């Protein structure tokens, strides 16, 4: 069903405007901060839903567009997402110490939570570092949901990526794979 061929052994990671990770379980499990949804044949889908998907990357894009408009009279480019990702790809994993908690609109558990960038230094105060740190922060958020699920779902041998946020941003897919320590499968139609 959906993007996951082997639901009993897979972890689905879907990044669109928001994002979620999901895993099929054989019974209902209450884990604070996670949701259970019905799944065919008497199973359940355990969901970690974040408000930090592609919309978070769009907020950073908006900042860069405002800088362009306000400082450079709007000489901007149409491929700014690609430029951001290209710059982020030149930055080493860990963003030279810059960290992002991408909770611009809170979380499902704490709607008042807000985003932050920490570890700023003269060396990492660049557009590429901000873009990379934000993508790494998104991956970290999904990974934390996975940690919450782990006692119930056990190890999952397959990680499946879905949604435009993963399909169109291969750097994000690579960062997710690195954070989860497993290859991320990207189905053609997911």
Question: Model features per residue range: what roles?
Answer:
Residues 1-160, 165-190:
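Active-site core segments that coordinate phosphate-bearing ligands/cofactors
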